[in-house]
Amino acid sequence: MTLALDIPLNDTQFSAQRKSEVLVEALPWIRRFQGRTVVVKYGGNAMVDPGLQQAFADDIVFMASVGIRPIVVHGGGPQINAMLAESATPVEFRNGLRVTSPEVMEVVRMVLVGQVGRQLVNRINAYAPLAAGMSGEDSGLLSARKSRVIVDGEQIDMGLVGDIVDVNIDLVISMLDRGQIPVIAPVSPEVDAAGRPTGQVLNVNADTAATAIAQALR
């Protein structure tokens, strides 16, 4: 015979019960992905809500703790917009799209590497020293070329905006093998048609960078 007792739970008991339920629900997912590498794009509302920021960091730590190898690629649109406004950086729009001028690129670089990436690394590392923040500029991680943007059949110069053309995937894999979680800002050095650095840095969309890294892992 089974007895169902309706006993009020305090916050601690409820939390423990809910955690156990989540673990049971996640077991099939854990078995499926254990030992595999997963690329996760961090962006949207999760970047501006402190509660969602922490929940994301918790999820990444949980993935690592059950044997999944996460790679995080992050954007920073809301923070970049806020910093551009705060610093009164001149911004030009063409066909409704923001042009990444050298001045805008300086803000993008500062926000992605110095603010968003650092905050996420700190949240993850509050549990254990797992996360390592980096950008596409570090050790030739990513290489990019300027994007060709076509609107209504016309090519538009969007400034320092690029697409990934090469990924140093061996660097990423070596970090994963050491038990690290790469947290990657997608600002990337530009290369010419021969693969030589031009000395310029390009702003790369985080979704595009995450896709390029995932494809390089295949």
Located regions from the model:
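Nucleotide/pyrophosphate-binding catalytic subdomain
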Residues: M1-R218
